[in-house]
Amino acid sequence: MKISYEDLLYLFEHDRDHVDETRFYFDDDPEEDEHYIGYIPEVKGEIVDKPYWIGYCDIDGGCEFKTAKELFEAKVFNGKSIKERWEHVILLEIGGYDADAESWHEKILSNRKRIDE
């Protein structure tokens, strides 16, 4: 069961405790290179201006963003964004947890319902 784009974006916007590091690849990439995205609000006790980050993309050394939306819409994966390439995204881990685990999807959805209430 694949998490929807909307649910993953929601998780990055509202339940940041579980997205410090997320691994994925694109199934239309013959090399299947892994990419990383995440959220780190502080470094050495200092609040960071751009807590959202991407590693292993078109920009050497990765890049940082103020919002999750900016991260998901950044055209840094062969000139396209995660949003544009979503149908080819294969999530491996979300916050260190197996992205395919049924319990993980239930947790995401239950957290979303709780936060929305």
Specify the residue positions occupied by each region the protein language model found:
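Residue-level signal for well-ordered alpha-helical segments
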Residues: 1-3, 32, 63
